[in-house]
Amino acid sequence: MNSYFEQASGFYGHPHQASGMAMGSGGHHDQTTASAAAAAYRGFTLPLGMSPYANHHLQRTTQDSPYDASITAACNKIYGDAGSAYKQDCLNIKADAVNGYKDIWNTGGANGGGGGGGGGAATAGNTSNGSNAPNAANGQNNAGGGGMPVRPSACTPDSRVGGYLDTSGGSPVSHRGGGSAGGGNGTAGGVPQNSASGVGGGVGAGTAWNANCTISGAAAAQTAAASSLHQPGNHTFYPWMAIAGESTADPIK
């Protein structure tokens, strides 16, 4: 019987396999035949990923791929020292000329975007800027009047979220401030934008991104009543009570 495993180039790839099995099938069970047959089945220690038919003496040497050089060059262009033009981020906010993320809404004095909710007319610096800084055009980079830091609008994408639209000026109103009806100019917000918070004077203070949100009055009472319904009490029935045979009327025994 010549099966796949009894061939010279069989699965185990041992040269003594065919001769050992052929002699064994003829009835010549001498010591040499037994040794050859045993050696044939001891030679199966080939790795699983290696083919016994491959010529391992003519293996291809390792070569550098032409794509490796292009990948290295691209990485150096982006992350290397020579690629400084690709390193624009929020840490490079100095002026519009070098700011890779130019804020198109909050850069002008009359377009809003001062540190506290609108640049106003840019004539009274610390009155319409909201951050008590004389530079109305750079208000988004100045700290608030109350010592509270204000996020740069270039790193604040929520200042351009749809829905916060100033219908009078046509520009989105930032979360930092601006009157809900006046669009963050000096007077339409209700009061001049030089409040103690320095974030959003007048009506805009409630919509500031870092304003403290508290619930009081009827809303607080309604919230407390709703939360009390979820508090566990003596009448609460848990699934383990049914498993243990507890009664819902008297869960504590």
Curated annotation (Swiss-Prot):
Residues 125-193 are annotated as: Disordered. One of its GO terms (molecular function) is DNA binding. A motif (Antp-type hexapeptide) lies at residues 237-242. Residues 176-189 have a biased composition (Gly residues). The keyword Calcium does not apply. The keyword Cytoplasm does not apply. Keywords: Activator, Developmental protein, DNA-binding, Homeobox, Nucleus, Transcription, Transcription regulation. Residues 125-141 have a biased composition (Low complexity). One of its GO terms (cellular component) is nucleus. It is found in: Nucleus. Belongs to the Antp homeobox family. Sequence-specific transcription factor which is part of a developmental regulatory system that provides cells with specific positional identities on the anterior-posterior axis. Binds the consensus region 5'-TTAAT[GT][GA]-3'. This homeotic protein controls development of the cells in the posterior thoracic and first abdominal segments. It activates the synthesis of the decapentaplegic (DPP) growth factor. This is Homeotic protein ultrabithorax.
